[in-house]
From Swiss-Prot:
InterPro entries: Sec13/Seh1_fam, WD40/YVTN_repeat-like_dom_sf, WD40_repeat_dom_sf, WD40_rpt. The lineage of its organism: Eukaryota, Fungi, Dikarya, Ascomycota, Taphrinomycotina. Its main location: membrane. The modification Phosphoserine is found at residue 29. This is Protein transport protein sec13. It is a peripheral membrane protein. It comes from Schizosaccharomyces pombe (strain 972 / ATCC 24843) (Fission yeast). One of its GO terms (molecular function) is structural molecule activity.
Length: 297
């Protein structure tokens, strides 16, 4: 385990490695983003990005095929897309369509193109599509009236791709988590050129804080995890065109709010970040989820 001294002056809200695992970006209530080189257990601060006027909640690296690009979501209602060229960082775009805190950003799988989804406390989700000519199309829709806390993309194939084969991109889908206690599934409809509600997943009894779609490599069904202020994590599964099935991750509630959920790259291990300052790792075995480990400071 490597410890990184971020030198932030306030609480850290997100830390994310790039595609190659060699750069770490962190963000904080001090309104800054820091980018580090992480190699051979050595950390080097490469840049401190300043542009937000409020806490920065979440970050997202774009796929490297689009360049060295980082998106940041802030309480100030802005999403800033940063680009590094020749070692110099600059603002590529300042997205100002939202009327309240932007709580989450998520880049689409690269098979879908350079697409960025943003979730806001104004209840809306915006999807930015960056074009090769430098232009950007924006679509915005109301996802959760009381506020939207998280957004994630479906993997490029939802049918359980065969290992070794390149999955078809398939239809574009999003999952969102909101202050209405719901998880919603959205599909892009080219006919109306916007996002259409496909499914509503009810089960939590307090705000849903995060949602994460499992990678589909080698899996025979679709897995989706949701984390909630009600101290529960649910696993939602779907086979083919069948209905979504809900399974509690644990028999007992977590000791505190379940803030974040994250799948391993292979989709077989789920990490849960909890308000008790621990990260819990789970793996499915014989249709039951078993605790593998607890990580704490």
């Amino acid at each position: 385990m490597t410890t990184v001294d971020t030198q932030h002056d306030d609480m850290i809200h997100d830390a994310i490695l790039d595609y190659y695992g060699k750069r770490l970006a962190t963000c904080s209530s001090d309104q800054t983003i820091k980018v580090f080189s992480i190699e051979n257990n050595q950390q080097t601060l490469l840049e401190t990005l300043r542009g937000h006027s409020g806490p920065v909640w979440q970050l997202g690296w774009a796929h490297p095929k689009f360049g060295t690009i980082l998106a940041s979501a802030s309480y100030d209602g802005h999403v800033i897309v940063w680009r590094e060229t020749g070692g110099v960082w600059s603002e590529l775009m300042d997205h100002t369509a939202h009327q309240a805190s932007v709580n989450a950003v998520s880049w689409a799988p690269h098979e879908y193109g350079a697409l960025l989804a943003c979730a806001s406390s104004d209840g809306k989700v915006s999807v930015l599509e960056f074009k090769d000519d430098g232009s950007c199309d924006t679509r915005i829709f109301t996802a959760h009236e009381p506020g939207c806390n998280a957004v994630c993309w479906s993997p490029p194939s939802l049918s359980g791709s065969v290992v070794g084969q390149s999955p078809a991109a398939g239809p574009k889908k999003l999952a969102t988590a909101g202050c209405d206690n719901l998880v919603k599934i959205w599909a892009f409809d080219a006919g109306v050129n916007n996002w259409i509600l496909e499914d509503t997943l009810a089960g939590h009894v307090d705000w849903t804080r995060d949602v994460a779609w499992a990678p589909s490599v080698g899996l025979t069904k679709t897995y989706l995890a949701s984390a909630s202020q009600d101290k529960n994590v649910f696993i939602w599964t779907k086979e083919g065109d069948g209905p979504w099935q809900k399974t509690p991750l644990t028999e007992e509630k977590f000791p505190d709010i379940a803030w974040r959920v994250s799948w391993s790259l292979s989709g077989n291990i789920l990490a849960v970040s909890c308000g008790d300052n621990k990260v819990y790792l789970f793996k499915e075995s014989q249709n039951k989820w078993q605790l593998l480990n607890e990580l704490s400071n």
